[in-house]
């Protein structure tokens, strides 16, 4: 990517700087201290935090209308805060369902059609959950990360936050309530998921149980395929199971932003324009960073590489963006802690929803 950019822009030399950990908080400190990069990468859930604290340059006057019009709808939502564009897309990563084909084959279970329903998903998960001790295996697993959990909420058409972002809606939104009940049932009624402790015995990666052929189905993104390929894992991909006739999932967008106090915004935009434009997006796709955020990029060759790559692209049509909030980080910490109690069956779905909403009120209304 660097070589391609510098060849097209010989007057600009790029220097990539890596932040080893705590990226979002570290960059806030650097910006406050006057250590200003020309361009930054920023996850979509951090864009509101930076934008509303006056740290980002608005891009509406820099980005062409052609660029904006070519963005997938799910991407447009991730780049704007209160109607103003503050970020350009690096890539977009919708969640899809990975299936461990070795486990399916060993159990004599056929890979379902790409129109499979959530009921079919549950029945398959039950069939693939068996054994005990060292011989135990499970039908499904997801790590307790809010983006993984929200993907299942999105499948049922649910939400995390109210429209104004000042409250959570787990106890008031009917579709979200259905999703919470379903996730509770996966652990406590159907018992098709390993606990976090059981999953951890296979390794630190959230996909370690899948790669150990101990979990048969798990949500992942495009980059997950690279992880499985490197491990030699046998897998295929299907869309999110259908609920009420629709396959819906969530999507996460990685972005490029320009600090408000960047030395030369015009030069910074030239970098961002390339990285988020047709050529840069194509490079990101070729390297399996994620899907292109723009319809300007031809995905025909990518879709032809495997029988299932088309499902990544198709997911963008119905995907909803991972919800962002200025106080999202504090909310997520609380939410994940409460999810632990729900998965363990220590609280009912109704109690869980009420507890989350009660704790969310003072967090989100700040």
What does each of the following model-derived ranges do?
Residues 29-30, 37-38, 68-103, 136-142, ...:
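A structural signal for short loop-to-beta-strand junctions that line the ligand-binding cleft
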Residues 125, 166-197:
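Glycine-centered hinge/linker elements that transmit conformational signals in sensory
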Residues 44-96, 119, 236-238, 300-310:
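Hinge/lid segment of periplasmic solute-binding proteins
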Residues 215-216, 254-290:
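Bilobed periplasmic-binding protein/Venus flytrap-like ligand-binding cleft at the lobe interface
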Residues 50-55, 75-112, 142-165, 251-257, ...:
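Periplasmic solute-binding protein
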Residues 78, 235, 285-337, 341:
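Long, aromatic- and glycine/proline-rich binding clefts that accommodate carbohydrate-like moieties
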Residues 1-52, 65-69, 93, 111, ...:
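Conserved N-terminal structural module of periplasmic/extracytoplasmic solute-binding proteins
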Residues 60-71, 113-114, 131-134, 138-139, ...:
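Short, solvent-exposed loop/beta-turn-alpha elements that line the ligand-binding surface or hinge
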């Amino acid at each position: 990517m660097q070589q391609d950019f510098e060849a097209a822009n010989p007057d600009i030399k790029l220097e990539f700087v890596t932040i080893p950990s705590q990226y979002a908080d570290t960059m806030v400190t650097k910006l406050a201290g006057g250590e200003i990069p020309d361009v930054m990468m920023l996850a979509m859930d951090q864009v509101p935090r930076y934008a509303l604290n006056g740290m980002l340059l608005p891009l509406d006057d820099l980005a062409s209308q052609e660029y904006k019009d070519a963005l997938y709808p799910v991407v447009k939502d991730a780049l704007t805060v209160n109607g103003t564009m503050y970020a350009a897309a690096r890539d977009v990563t919708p969640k899809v369902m990975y299936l461990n084909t070795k486990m399916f084959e060993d159990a004599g279970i056929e890979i379902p059609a790409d129109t499979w329903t959530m009921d079919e998903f549950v029945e398959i998960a039950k069939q693939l959950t068996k054994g005990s001790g060292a011989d135990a295996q499970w039908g499904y697993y997801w790590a307790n990360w809010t983006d993984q959990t929200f993907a299942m909420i999105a499948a049922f058409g649910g939400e995390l936050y109210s429209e104004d972002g000042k409250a959570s809606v787990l106890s008031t939104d009917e579709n979200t309530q259905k999703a919470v009940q379903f996730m509770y049932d996966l652990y406590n009624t159907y018992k098709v998921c390993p606990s976090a402790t059981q999953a951890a015995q296979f390794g630190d990666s959230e996909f370690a149980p899948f790669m150990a052929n101990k979990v048969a189905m798990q949500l992942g993104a495009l980059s997950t395929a690279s992880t499985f390929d490197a491990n030699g894992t046998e897998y295929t991909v299907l869309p999110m199971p259908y609920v009420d006739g629709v396959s819906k999932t969530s999507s996460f967008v990685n972005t490029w932003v320009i600090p408000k106090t960047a030395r030369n915004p015009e030069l910074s935009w030239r970098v961002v324009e390339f990285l988020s434009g047709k050529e840069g997006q194509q490079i990101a796709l070729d390297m399996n960073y994620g899907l292109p955020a723009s319809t300007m990029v031809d995905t025909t060759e990518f879709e032809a590489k495997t029988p299932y790559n088309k499902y990544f692209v198709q997911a963008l049509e119905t995907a909803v963006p991972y919800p962002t909030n200025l106080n999202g980080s504090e909310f997520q910490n609380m939410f994940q802690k409460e999810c632990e109690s729900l998965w363990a069956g220590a609280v009912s779905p109704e109690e869980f929803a009420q507890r989350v909403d009660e704790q969310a009120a003072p967090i989100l209304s700040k």
